[in-house]
């Protein structure tokens, strides 16, 4: 049955632009957009339900394309210690940092991880998020990476959202592989990835290419394994130093390379040629008080598509609001509101390989959209907080919180 959503204005975000339709309407049929356009051009038809949006602005549902939403515990005490002058290295040496999250995640049951993640993600839903990517990477062995990926699949079953799972086993070196990074990478490639993929738990494969994680050569080993399994790849790259990770990602036609503060112009050109999306993570940049900015002008100059994401994680970006990330993207990285909104809609969809079905409001695409109590789409980026979403629609059905 067809449902009519009328009396609204629409920012479709086609081609990464507002692409306004004023005095508009949307017709949904099942989970898809059947028709979209000016209300005066609405075809004569019979509708099972008519919804008056009362002049609201409508945007595509938000897509959070880089998160670590499943984890045990939190690191708020470490946050306070850092502000008291304790260095990250000192925290890590005392058993804190990512090691503490690995311990807490390993100790937690599937049910505990699921319940804590659902609380966080429901907050994001209320902010307009309808699609989310979630990474593993706090288990760091087969049993616990599997546990995390099973929880991610369960989130997709429990919530009316599109949920994509990414295996990030190559996130950090687990304690049982201390000083044996090559052996751990071999374990990922010969044991973990093939088994997890065979169980249908993996949509994409990610790795952390950095001096404190894994080298480009080690990451390439992971990428080759993913490629042999038919899985797309993504990469944490150039966050703290320039190792050429983003160029490596481009060579393997990665969906995205993420962080990118230290990427070079050659890296940018390589990503432009491969079509790899640049995912910027201003929440981590903000919390870590970084001073090295991603090369925004170069990315734009060379036509690299820019996405934004929360990077929700317990250590460096405990961000539960993608709208706050929008403002950070504009304020810190000087993206225009239009560029920022493209970064959490159509460009974020491209970073997940979903651009044919998600990310913009067009006939035939999935009916994920948000109605906003605003006078112009730039307000979504401008306001810090506030109850702006009037309705969140997922697969053609309004989400009731």
UniProtKB/Swiss-Prot annotation:
Identify the InterPro entries for this entry.
Answer: Amidohydro-rel, HutI, Metal-dep_hydrolase_composite, Metal_Hydrolase
Q: What is its main location?
A: cytoplasm
Residues annotated as binding Fe(3+) are: 66, 68, 236, 311
How the cofactor is bound: the record states: Binds 1 zinc or iron ion per subunit.
| Alphabetical UniProt keywords | Cytoplasm, Histidine metabolism, Hydrolase, Iron, Metal-binding, Zinc
Q: Mind listing the GO biological process terms from this record?
A: L-histidine catabolic process to glutamate and formamide; L-histidine catabolic process to glutamate and formate
Q: In which pathway does it act?
A: Amino-acid degradation; L-histidine degradation into L-glutamate; N-formimidoyl-L-glutamate from L-histidine: step 3/3
Where is this protein localized, as stated in its record?
Cytoplasm
| Task of the protein | Catalyzes the hydrolytic cleavage of the carbon-nitrogen bond in imidazolone-5-propanoate to yield N-formimidoyl-L-glutamate. It is the third step in the universal histidine degradation pathway.
| The name this protein goes by in its record | Imidazolonepropionase
Taxon lineage: Bacteria, Pseudomonadati, Pseudomonadota, Gammaproteobacteria, Moraxellales
Originating gene:
hutI
């Amino acid at each position: 049955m067809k449902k009519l959503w009328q009396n609204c204005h629409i920012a479709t975000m086609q081609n990464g632009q507002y692409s306004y339709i004023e005095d508009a309407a949307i017709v949904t049929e099942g989970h898809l957009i059947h028709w979209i356009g000016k209300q005066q051009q609405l075809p004569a038809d019979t509708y099972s339900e008519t919804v008056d949006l009362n002049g609201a602005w409508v945007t595509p549902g938000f897509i959070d394309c880089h998160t670590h939403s499943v984890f045990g515990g939190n690191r708020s005490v470490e946050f306070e210690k850092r502000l008291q002058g304790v260095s990250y290295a000192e925290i890590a040496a005392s058993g804190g940092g990512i090691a503490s999250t690995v311990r807490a995640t390993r100790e937690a049951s599937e049910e505990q991880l699921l319940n804590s993640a659902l609380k966080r993600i429901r907050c994001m839903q209320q902010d307009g998020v309808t699609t989310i990517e979630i990474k593993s990477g706090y288990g760091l062995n087969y049993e616990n990476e599997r546990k995390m990926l099973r929880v991610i699949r369960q989130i997709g079953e429990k919530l009316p959202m599109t949920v994509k799972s990414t295996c990030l086993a190559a996130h950090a070196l687990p304690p049982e592989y201390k000083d044996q990074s090559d052996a751990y990478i071999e374990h990922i490639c010969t044991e973990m990835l093939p088994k997890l993929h065979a169980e249908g738990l993996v949509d994409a494969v990610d790795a952390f290419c950095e001096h404190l994680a894994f080298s480009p050569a080690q990451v390439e080993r992971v990428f080759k394994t993913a490629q042999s399994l038919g899985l797309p790849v993504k990469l944490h790259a150039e966050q703290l130093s320039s190792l050429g990770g983003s160029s490596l990602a481009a060579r393997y036609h990665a969906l995205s390379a993420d962080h990118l503060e230290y990427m070079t112009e050659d890296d940018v050109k390589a990503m432009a040629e491969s079509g790899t999306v640049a995912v910027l993570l201003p929440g981590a940049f903000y919390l870590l008080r970084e001073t090295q900015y991603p090369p925004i002008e170069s990315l734009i100059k060379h036509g690299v598509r820019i996405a934004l994401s929360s990077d929700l994680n317990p250590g460096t970006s405990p961000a539960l609001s993608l709208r706050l990330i929008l403002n950070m993207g504009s304020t810190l990285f000087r993206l225009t509101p239009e560029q920022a909104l493209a970064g959490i809609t159509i460009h974020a969809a491209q970073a997940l390989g979903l651009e044919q079905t998600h990310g913009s409001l067009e006939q035939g695409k999935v009916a994920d959209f948000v109605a906003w109590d605003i006078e112009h789409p730039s307000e979504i980026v401008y306001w810090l907080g506030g109850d702006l979403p009037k309705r969140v629609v997922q697969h053609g059905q309004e989400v009731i919180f």
